[in-house]
């Protein structure tokens, strides 16, 4: 089974899955493999062919004893993707997950950053230093575009189209996204004042090098974002998607509809934006504009 997992993860790389997603799928499958091999026998392709729906339900029950439902569903999604890979390559005829319905999860509301908090966060880096200017450019990009961390670190310098204020976000959801004037100005400074001479290899196309001169890591960016959130005095529950949620919610409160968010995020289905459907509810808007010290100057219907 080890060989099959390696082949599967190689295919995910070919399909341009984010490295973080590839590693999560790999770890999920290794846990499933350990469960299959709990009697000490190595799991083989024949063992996978012999699996039935009840085996998957038994494994699901074992996961549910120690994990939240969201994590259980992620494990099952990894299995579904793996067995689909085996089917596509003619290694099995049917998947034991065919027709299996995952329990629905009611999404919680994302942490809401106020515009003033975002401004404080973005302005926290000391851009008189090259690292601070790089960090300011990354934060401006995250808020200007709503891109994910893994999309940010995969950017190359050539993905910026500053003359037309656009950035090309590559990957499975490749798209062109507009940039704010503020982001364009900071990125121009970064490209001329900070990036030159900071690459370990001058021909490296990466937009944001880390301290070692090679492409900065996802964890490296996340640590920086948390550091600047703390420096900005933000005490809220902060996670890698908080800036993305702020981008979406502020646009919706400004009047953009969910179909616009769908295009900016590269979603294929409008249902993927359901997390933000509450934002235009009258009660939510009224509370937001009533209690937000800056937005309170505007009308809830503005």
Residue ranges and their predicted role:
Residues 1-302:
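Conserved catalytic core of the tyrosine transesterase superfamily
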């Amino acid at each position: 089974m080890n060989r099959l997992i390696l082949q599967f993860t190689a295919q995910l790389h070919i399909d341009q899955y984010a490295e973080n997603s590839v590693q999560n799928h790999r770890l999920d499958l290794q846990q499933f493999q350990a469960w299959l091999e709990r009697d000490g026998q190595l799991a083989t392709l024949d063992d996978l062919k012999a699996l039935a729906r009840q085996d998957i339900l038994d494994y699901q029950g074992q996961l549910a004893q120690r994990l939240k439902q969201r994590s259980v569903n992620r494990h099952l999604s990894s299995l579904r993707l793996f067995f689909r890979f085996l089917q596509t390559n003619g290694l099995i005829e049917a998947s034991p997950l065919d027709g299996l319905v995952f329990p629905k999860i009611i999404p919680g509301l994302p942490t809401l950053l106020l515009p003033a908090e975002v401004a404080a966060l973005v302005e926290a880096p000391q851009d008189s230093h090259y690292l601070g200017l790089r960090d300011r450019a990354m934060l401006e990009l995250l808020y200007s575009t709503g891109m994910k961390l893994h999309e940010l670190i995969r950017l190359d310098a050539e993905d910026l189209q500053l003359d037309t204020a656009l950035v090309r976000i590559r990957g499975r959801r490749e798209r062109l996204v507009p940039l704010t004037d503020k982001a364009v100005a900071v990125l121009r400074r970064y490209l001329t004042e900070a990036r030159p001479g900071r690459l370990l290899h001058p021909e490296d196309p990466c937009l944001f090098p880390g301290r070692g001169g090679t492409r900065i890591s996802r964890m490296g960016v996340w640590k920086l974002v948390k550091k600047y959130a703390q420096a900005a005095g933000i005490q809220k529950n902060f996670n890698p998607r908080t800036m993305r949620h702020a981008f979406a919610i502020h646009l919706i409160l400004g009047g953009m509809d969910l179909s616009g968010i769908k295009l900016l995020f590269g979603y294929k289905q409008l249902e993927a934006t359901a997390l933000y459907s509450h934002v235009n509810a009258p009660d939510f808007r009224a509370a937001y504009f009533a209690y937000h010290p800056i937005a309170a100057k505007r009308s809830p219907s503005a």
